[in-house]
Amino acid sequence: MENKIEVNNKDEMNKWFEEFKKGNGLVDTFTNPYSFCESVPNLERFVFQMASATDDAQKDSIYASALVEATKFCAPIYECAWVSSTGIVKKGLEWFEKNAGTIKSWDESYIELKVEVPKIEQLANYQQAALKWRKDIGFRVNANTAALSHKVLAEYKVPGEIVMSVKEMLSDMIRRRNLILNRGGDENPRGPVSREHVEWCREFVKGKYIMAFNPPWGDINKSGRSGIALVATGLAKLAETEGKGVFDEAKKTVEALNGYLDKHKDEVDKASADNMITNLLKHIAKAQELYKNSSALRAQGAQIDTAFSSYYWLYKAGVTPETFPTVSQFLFELGKQPRGTKKMKKALLSTPMKWGKKLYELFADDSFQQNRIYMHPAVLTAGRISEMGVCFGTIPVANPDDAAQGSGHTKSILNLRTNTETNNPCAKTIVKLFEIQKTGFNIQDMDIVASEHLLHQSLVGKQSPFQNAYNVKGNATSANII
């Protein structure tokens, strides 16, 4: 077997794709870039099947079947071909050999990370490595393979018939987020943070230093129920949505305030002024500490960069450019028929290729007891095989034309359009998956609700599985659903 997508740069990619498009019925009616999707997937039958299911194994199987049906034909073909092309495969794998130091903090702790929640530094280092990998190998070929840095969507337009369902999903996402922010894993649980306090901090860091004289809660040193100064909790919360740059801005504001007080020293009580400056700097330092240990930052750092993690798993499994086509074929077949975890693991162990057993050995331990939203994004699980699938299994590289048969992998759903002209098929499909899950399971008992995670990805503005959203600013659950 050999990789038939012999491409090393964008010009060669464009040429390959034009040839491929001539012989295959690619369309872009319902998807962003071209795909094999000719109609919006109809998942209604899975709701009825789920309603009559009697055990969890049966329910899991039904949901897996619905996922394959939903995503079988909607992957972005151009981008999938690029991710699996000979040039990217070669550079993508070689990068890990040359950058052992870059991935050291989490790669050397892989065994521990299979069973334990990662340290904040291990998450931050993963995200830095992912961005470096993208830059070093020239991964970006268009906007659909870019590292995003915009703000989350302010508005998300959906058809009238699903508005209430999307709002229900958002409400559950907010409930989970509040549980995490107010309780889950912070070394200093700070309690809820008032929007009024955050807004005050937002204005303060813009340079409005006179506001320090009279904050809405009274004394600048006043603490909340947690015993932590309200300035500190407000700044930490602001940093979660605006980025850690707010701390530098806050320090500049304090410098400006100090300059003002010094300039008007004849009208200022020196002891009080010095005390205010000292305390403000102390509150900023506390805010930085809270931010560093925050569950929100942890959840942000745990976001998977689909392409980067998938290449890391190939590298760890000893896959080479020569054996890559066998992995591609395996994942293509995996996406044609839904398989439960047991069957998928058995398939990996049954392949004569060494990478099968090695991928199996990379799987997270079943004894991982924490909330799985915190699991390190470089740790492979049975569910995350789908991340590899969308990268390498959409197009079997030894026989690219076979892609027309369809191969379903979860993140392909992000390629469905979100515009109103097409009635937002992305949201409609995600909502139907949520309805299927809700019919079979108690949503509130689940650590991660897969359909809600997909909605979150859409709300942060992802329109492709291959975009990195680590630097997207803002809170996705604040979007106005209209």
Swiss-Prot record:
Sites annotated Homooligomerization: F213, E267, V268, M276, P352
Names of the cofactor(s): Mn(2+)
UniProt modification remark: Cleaved at the DQVD motif by host CASP3/caspase 3 in mammalian cells at 48 hours postinfection giving rise to cleavage products of about 30 kDa and 22 kDa that remain associated. Only the monomeric form is cleaved. Little or no cleavage in tick cells. Caspase cleavage reduces the viral polymerase activity. Caspase cleavage is not required for productive infection in mammalian or tick host cells.
Principal subcellular localization: virion
Alphabetically ordered keywords of this record: Capsid protein, Helical capsid protein, Ribonucleoprotein, RNA-binding, Viral nucleoprotein, Virion
Residue window of motif DEVD: 266-269
CC cofactor note: Endonuclease activity is stimulated by divalent cations such as Mn2+, Co2+, and Mg2+.
GO molecular function: RNA binding
Any one annotated GO CC term: viral nucleocapsid
Annotated site residue numbers, Cleavage by host CASP3/caspase 3: D269, K270
Locations listed in the record: Virion
Family: Belongs to the nairovirus nucleocapsid protein family.
Free-text domain note: The DQVD motif is a CASP3/caspase 3 cleavage site essential for viral replication in host cell. However, the importance for viral replication is apprently not linked to caspase cleavage. This motif is involved in homooligomerization.
Subunit structure: Probable homooligomer; forms a double superhelical polymer. Monomer.
Described purpose of this protein according to its UniProt entry: Binds dsRNA and ssRNA and probably participates in the packaging of viral genome. In the dsRNA binding mode, the nucleocapsid protein specifically binds to the vRNA panhandle secondary structure formed at the termini of viral genome. Does not discriminate between viral and nonviral RNAs through ssRNA binding mode. Displays dsDNA endonuclease activity that is sequence non-specific.
Record-given protein name: Nucleoprotein
Species this protein is from: Crimean-Congo hemorrhagic fever virus (isolate C68031)
